[in-house]
Amino acid sequence: MSMARPYLGDPKRTIEVLQKYNFAFQKRFGQNFLIDTHVLDKIIDSAQITKDDFVLEIGPGIGTMTQYLAEAAREVAAVEIDTTLIPILQDTLKDWDNVTVINNDILKVDIRQLALEKNQGRPIKVVANLPYYITTPIIMGLFENQVPIDSITIMVQKEVADRMQVGPGTKDYGALSLAVQYYAKPQIVANVPPNCFMPRPKVGSAVIRLERYAEPPVEVKDEKLMFRIIRASFNQRRKTLVNGLKNSPEVPFSKEQIEEALGMCGLSLNIRGEALTLEQFAQLANAFSSL
């Protein structure tokens, strides 16, 4: 491996690279490049990357964080959807021989196969500065597809990071909170203001670390059923749980069966989905499974 040092993350160097390639930001890809070395260091520290690690980076942009990851990890695979960035990445990463750039949509990449080839199927670490519009599908895809993951350390919209770690009874609590907390332990490790990016986003961001559980914190017989119940509960969050589930095509149970399942769990017929904990949703799914 080369002895090169990461040099991107400095606004001046970033502008030089963009001008050299006459790069135009693509709004449809939600591109905001990091230009703050302190934040980059914080992400690398929070991800707890060592020389034994294989790291998957989603959305490397011009390779700013990739340079830092390549310094810290054994090997990095960086998946970039924007074809116009590939020649830039080949240039900015030429001094690191432990980086593979993959020009593809992360939702179409077989990450399990990648982990098998690059890491003998052992758990990988995921690091990303995610476009806001696609945060949820990417995170849920990583969790639901049974990819072997140790942790996910990501930059997301502050509001999304908050939603991932809140509990019942708060306005931000929802299906994403429950899904993340079923698979991982979430921890916000840094708040990042808009001036740390180019171009500046309109909202604040946060770095959140999701440490994958070896086993989920609750026992549930049918995961898919539990998540269908959760989605139905929050699709009409102002309705009672009975009405929310009764009106949902995802939950094939009658009003009587719904009331019976709630009774088995000792839950009020007037309760709303937003009041239930993950454990209570698991109990409810198990009650439905036993009907």
What does each model-identified segment do?
Residues 1-228, 232, 263, 274, ...:
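Catalytic cores of RNA-modifying enzymes
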